[in-house]
Structures are given as C-alpha cells and as structure tokens.
Amino acid sequence: MKTKIKYLRQEMGITQKDLAEKVGVSRQTINALENGKYNPSLLVAYKITQLLNKEHIEEVFVFEDEEI
C-alpha cells in the first residue's frame, strides 16, 4: 500500500515522532507506513487520516490492486 503520509505530515510541519504519539504507535511504525512496508489497521488508518486533516482515507492511503 502506498501512502501520502510523509508529504502531508511534512506539509503540516509534523515529525514522525509527533504523529506516532498522537496516533498511539511507534515512530518506527510511521516510518514503515511511509515506506510502504506496513499495512495499518483500519483504526490506525482512520486516526492518521483525521490527524492529517483529511476526510477520506483514500486521500492518505492509496490501495493497490492485489490478486485474491
């Protein structure tokens, strides 16, 4: 999954550490999300979306087509 977290976070002047603390995850988790190495739970995705002042998860997370 690709994300726009890094771009949006930097645009708002928020560090990985600050975002992690507000979401309730580690800084390493935010780093993994930004690098596409971790798929968040729906709750974490929702919290990040709210904290980045977006209304829709799709504005932050780009879901890639996966074969089932």
Residue map of PLM features:
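Recognition helix of helix-turn-helix/homeodomain-like DNA-binding domains
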Residues: 25-38
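Short, charged recognition helix plus adjacent turn
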Residues: 50, 58-68
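Short, basic-rich loop-to-helix N-cap that marks the start of a DNA-contacting helix
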Residues: 37-50
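Short basic helix-loop element that most often maps to the first helix and adjoining turn
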Residues: 3-22
